[in-house]
């Protein structure tokens, strides 16, 4: 968009993204807005101007230069049909940020699970090294609300956001994993994979694609990009030691990066130093990776650099090993020394509601994984722990908890609540001991009482609902906050100690 011309812009969707777009554009363009939800329109009217609100029946929507669409709006919506009928280009807040920050470097992360943790971890590593890479996107900070940066941005991008980008081009793009999700929006897996793959659009030989080749769908994307030969490819794995790439296997990070793969950036932060790490760091306590493929390669290429994975309660489990592998790869491409990467992994504080360690009492540890809104996501935290008192429930997703059945051996007892309680109970019947509860509070209380009576050395109370939250909560955040509050009550009684 040309800021020298008073163009006419439509902003459709008035959630966090739409509001940030309006604030960015209102003084530069003639802007009209709309949202299907009256509550959002009412909030906008209170904050800004009623005159900017225009229903889709208003002819002004047919005479716009551009429409900025929020990612929550499906491409089957009437507004998209209007845009097509009147040849109005559709753009997004991601493209707007890119347009005004083209001199900066963009690191983009997508995947079905693990996006937020990886986005935050990469930002933490880079910022701890003296760089300036704030997070934005699907992580809770909309693109246009991100703080100004000197070096670049780390963006979490959902499939909905990727469907909308037209000009955004990442310098480094990460594909963590792909499992069936959002098929109500994307119709089928082919469309879903195509949406995820858009993160690599417009990238070239000066760009890097970091891809998890353990995942079948991701490996297909990797092979396709390999055939195209237009992007530098960095594979990563937690199942095998790669001859060229990043692996996190047997408590070790193994990196085989040739000298010519280093990423040449113009760093604006004066405190950044690309020192070569000399020697292998002391071996800290390591994350235990329980599962590897039988065909695991035991031999290391002589040129590998390999380091112990620093133990961090907030980064447990195979899924977090994937997040660590991807983050290490990105930081290595940028030029951060291995010692600094490992220190940053060790000091990383997890995002709320994502396998968040709350604290412990008498060998009972409390973990909040409220973000685990489906079984595939919950599997990751369940695999990471043993002797689990599992809190699960809400509005069930298709397939229920069938994906978790192979890992029921990790669960000591389950506490089911919400709309899913009977469905989950039928799946667990005769396999796992369980209790049906009215709500999360009751489930928490019963789990705590049972864990106190357990003489085992290690006990874990885990909230991994495997469901959406809308039957009893506004969102997964509110659900997770209640779990934290229940833990805090124990803390006030002097029971829980040492959350980190």
From Swiss-Prot:
One of its GO terms (biological process) is peptidoglycan biosynthetic process. Pfam families: Mur_ligase_C, Mur_ligase_M, MurD-like_N. Pathway: Cell wall biogenesis; peptidoglycan biosynthesis. It comes from the Bacteria. ATP binds at residues 111-117. It is an enzyme of class 6 (ligase). It is found in: Cytoplasm. Keywords: ATP-binding, Cell cycle, Cell division, Cell shape, Cell wall biogenesis/degradation, Cytoplasm, Ligase, Nucleotide-binding, Peptidoglycan synthesis. InterPro entries: Folylpolyglutamate_synth_CS, Mur-like_cat_sf, Mur_ligase_C, Mur_ligase_C_dom_sf, Mur_ligase_cen, MurD, RPE3. It catalyses: UDP-N-acetyl-alpha-D-muramoyl-L-alanine + D-glutamate + ATP = UDP-N-acetyl-alpha-D-muramoyl-L-alanyl-D-glutamate + ADP + phosphate + H(+). GO terms for cellular component: cytoplasm. GO terms for molecular function: ATP binding; tetrahydrofolylpolyglutamate synthase activity; UDP-N-acetylmuramoylalanine-D-glutamate ligase activity. Residues 260-306 form the RPE3 insert domain. Its EC number is 6.3.2.9. NCBIfam families: murD, RPE3. Belongs to the MurCDEF family. Cell wall formation. Catalyzes the addition of glutamate to the nucleotide precursor UDP-N-acetylmuramoyl-L-alanine (UMA). PANTHER family: UDP-N-ACETYLMURAMOYLALANINE--D-GLUTAMATE LIGASE (PTHR43692:SF1). This is UDP-N-acetylmuramoylalanine--D-glutamate ligase.
């Amino acid at each position: 968009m040309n800021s020298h011309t008073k163009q006419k812009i439509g902003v459709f969707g008035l959630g966090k993204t739409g509001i940030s777009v309006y604030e960015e554009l209102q003084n530069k363009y003639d802007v009209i807005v709309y949202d299907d939800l009256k509550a959002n329109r009412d909030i906008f009217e209170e904050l800004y101007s009623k005159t900017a609100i225009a229903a889709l029946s208003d002819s002004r929507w047919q005479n716009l230069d551009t429409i900025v669409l929020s990612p929550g709006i499906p491409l089957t919506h009437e507004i998209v049909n209007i845009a097509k009928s009147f040849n109005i280009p559709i753009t997004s807040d991601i493209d707007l940020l890119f347009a005004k920050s083209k001199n900066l470097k963009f690191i983009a992360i997508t995947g079905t699970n693990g996006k937020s943790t990886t986005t935050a971890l990469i930002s933490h590593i880079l910022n701890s090294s003296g760089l300036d890479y704030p997070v934005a996107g699907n992580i809770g900070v909309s693109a246009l609300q991100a703080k100004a940066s000197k070096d670049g941005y780390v963006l979490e991008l959902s499939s909905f956001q990727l469907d909308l980008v037209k000009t955004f081009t990442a310098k480094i793009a990460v594909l963590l994993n792909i499992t069936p999700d959002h098929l109500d929006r994307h119709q089928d897996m082919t469309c879903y994979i195509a949406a995820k793959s858009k993160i690599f659009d417009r990238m070239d030989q000066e760009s890097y694609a970091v891809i998890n080749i353990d995942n079948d769908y991701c490996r297909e994307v990797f092979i396709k990009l390999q055939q195209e030969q237009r992007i530098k490819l960095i594979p990563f794995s937690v199942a095998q030691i790669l001859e060229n790439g990043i692996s996190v296997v047997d408590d070790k990070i193994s990196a085989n990066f040739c000298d010519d793969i280093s990423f040449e950036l113009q760093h604006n932060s004066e405190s950044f130093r690309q020192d070569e790490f000399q020697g292998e760091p002391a071996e800290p306590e390591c994350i235990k990776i329980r599962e590897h493929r039988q065909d695991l390669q035991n031999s290391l290429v002589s040129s590998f650099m390999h380091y112990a994975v620093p133990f961090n309660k907030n980064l447990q489990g195979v899924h977090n090993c994937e997040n660590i592998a991807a983050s290490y790869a990105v930081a290595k491409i940028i030029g951060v020394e291995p010692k600094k990467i490992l220190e940053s992994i060790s000091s990383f504080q997890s995002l709320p509601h994502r396998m968040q360690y709350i604290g412990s009492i008498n060998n009972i540890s409390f973990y909040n994984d409220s973000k685990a809104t489906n079984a595939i996501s919950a599997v990751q935290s369940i695999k990471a722990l043993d002797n689990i008192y599992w809190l699960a429930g809400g509005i069930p997703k298709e397939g229920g908890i069938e994906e978790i059945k192979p890992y029921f051996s990790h669960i000591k007892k389950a506490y089911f609540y919400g709309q899913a309680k009977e469905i989950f109970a039928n799946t667990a019947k005769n396999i796992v001991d369980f209790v049906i509860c009215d709500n999360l509070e009751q489930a928490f209380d019963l789990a705590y009482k049972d864990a106190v009576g357990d003489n085992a050395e290690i006990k874990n109370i885990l909230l991994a609902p495997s469901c959406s939250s809308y039957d009893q909560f506004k969102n997964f955040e509110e659900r997770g906050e209640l779990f934290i509050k229940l833990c805090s009550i124990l803390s006030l009684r002097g029971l829980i100690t040492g959350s980190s």
